[in-house]
Every structure is written in structure tokens, then in C-alpha cells.
Amino acid sequence: VATVDCSEYPKPVCSLEYMPLCGSDSQTYSNECNFCNAVVDSNGTLTLSHFGKC
């Protein structure tokens, strides 16, 4: 199972680095920072489906 450590988030600004992750909502997030901010916003209901585009 793919996991991402989101303990250091949310962050106010994410880098433009492109390393896509696919969330459990079938949305592709451009990087770990954007994904983790979305996890925080979802109160932990959003999870990582897999690394790469959805």
C-alpha cells in the first residue's frame, strides 16, 4: 500500500515540482504538498490511491 507522510502539513505554499499522486477521489495531485493539503482539508478522509496520474 502506498503511503505519504502528511504530518508536516498543511503548508501555505507548495512548490511547482511535478511528481503526481492519485488520490482516493480519483483526482491527480501535482505533488505531495498539494495532496497532503487536500488530505488535511478532507479531515483525513482522502487517501492515496497510488503514485502517478490517476
Curated annotation (Swiss-Prot):
Presence of keyword Calcium: no
Carbohydrate attachment residues: N43
Subcellular location: Secreted
UniProt keyword list: Disulfide bond, Glycoprotein, Protease inhibitor, Repeat, Secreted, Serine protease inhibitor
Site positions for Reactive bond 3: L16, E17
InterPro entries: Bifunctional_prot_inhibitor, Kazal_dom, Kazal_dom_sf, Prot_inh_Kazal-m
Intrachain S-S bonds: C6-C36, C14-C33, C22-C54
UniProt domain Kazal-like: residue ranges: 4-54
One GO cellular component term noted in the UniProt record for this chain: extracellular region
Keyword Glycoprotein appears in the UniProt entry: yes
Taxonomic superkingdom: Eukaryota
GO molecular function per UniProt: serine-type endopeptidase inhibitor activity
The record's note on its domains: Avian ovomucoid consists of three homologous, tandem Kazal family inhibitory domains.
Protein name: Ovomucoid
Species per Swiss-Prot/TrEMBL record: Caracara plancus (Southern caracara)
